[in-house]
Amino acid sequence: MPTNNQLVRCGRKSKIRASKSPALNGNPFAKGVCVLVKTITPRKPNSALRKMARVRFRNGTCVNAYIPGEGHNLQEHSTVLVRGGRVPDLPGVRYHIVRGVYDTQGVKNRKQGRSRYGTKRPK
């Protein structure tokens, strides 16, 4: 327990919280190029083939990013926009690819929740 004099001299140091998406360097988004596009299986008890891409940013760092939605058109050398946000059942995947930006197309035939998947309003 510090004395009042010690608190006046030094004050309390607040804890520094570790970032959940360190590769973005505090930015909301980052532009990158796909190095690898593949499917991986989730942890127990879930079962699926989840789509993910390995993305290299301009500064050279590589991250694993999840491709949300049904179907995608990404391949190697595609330019993508990456945001933070983990996928709970995929270990090591802490980023999401933003649909409908750069080379990533929006999800086809999407009627609800379109803004998350880069889909235009149907006529």
Curated annotation (Swiss-Prot):
Please give the residue positions where the record annotates the modification 3-methylthioaspartic acid: D89
Q: Which InterPro entries match?
A: NA-bd_OB-fold, Ribosomal_uS12, Ribosomal_uS12_bac
Q: Name one GO cellular component term.
A: small ribosomal subunit
- UniProt entry keywords in alphabetical sequence: Methylation, Ribonucleoprotein, Ribosomal protein, RNA-binding, rRNA-binding, tRNA-binding
Q: One matching Pfam family, short form?
A: Ribosom_S12_S23
**SUPFAM superfamilies, per the entry:** Nucleic acid-binding proteins
Q: Name one GO biological process term.
A: translation
GO molecular function terms noted in the UniProt entry = rRNA binding; structural constituent of ribosome; tRNA binding
Q: Subunit notes for this chain?
A: Part of the 30S ribosomal subunit. Contacts proteins S8 and S17. May interact with IF1 in the 30S initiation complex.
Q: Which family does it belong to?
A: Belongs to the universal ribosomal protein uS12 family.
Q: What does this protein do?
A: With S4 and S5 plays an important role in translational accuracy. Interacts with and stabilizes bases of the 16S rRNA that are involved in tRNA selection in the A site and with the mRNA backbone. Located at the interface of the 30S and 50S subunits, it traverses the body of the 30S subunit contacting proteins on the other side and probably holding the rRNA structure together. The combined cluster of proteins S8, S12 and S17 appears to hold together the shoulder and platform of the 30S subunit.
What HAMAP family has UniProt attached to this entry? Ribosomal_uS12_B
Q: What is this protein called?
A: Small ribosomal subunit protein uS12
